[in-house]
């Protein structure tokens, strides 16, 4: 999109992923809405800024392949409550629980309550 060499795209990717490494997935009420929509916007901005940095000659100190490996390891080591279960993080706050209650009522498992 911006031009540049393949090496710059690798640095842009490494910079972008490094900035978001360890970000939890905590959808309120199990819905990909709160806080996901805003995080997607922030992620888009992060990607564009990382691309601009790489095109300006900023290089990731950690090679992109190692950043990807680290991302995999971090993701596997995150507690289950922080991996899109709707149980931890913002989903587990009193307000997050109240939103879930308002949407789904007393359903124990809102994701599977419609089957």
Regions found by a protein language model. Give the residues of each.
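Functionally critical mobile loop/hinge segments
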Residues: 2-115
């Amino acid at each position: 999109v911006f031009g540049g060499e393949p090496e710059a795209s690798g640095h842009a990717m490494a910079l972008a992923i490094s900035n978001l490494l360890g970000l939890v997935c905590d959808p309120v009420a199990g819905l990909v809405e709160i806080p996901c929509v805003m995080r997607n916007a922030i992620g888009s901005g992060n990607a564009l800024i990382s691309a601009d940095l790489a095109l300006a000659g900023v290089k990731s100190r950690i090679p992109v392949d190692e950043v990807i490996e680290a991302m995999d390891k971090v993701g596997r080591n995150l507690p289950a409550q922080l991996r899109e279960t709707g149980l931890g993080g913002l989903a587990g706050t009193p307000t997050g629980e109240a939103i879930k209650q308002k949407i789904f009522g007393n359903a124990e498992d809102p994701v599977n309550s419609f089957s």
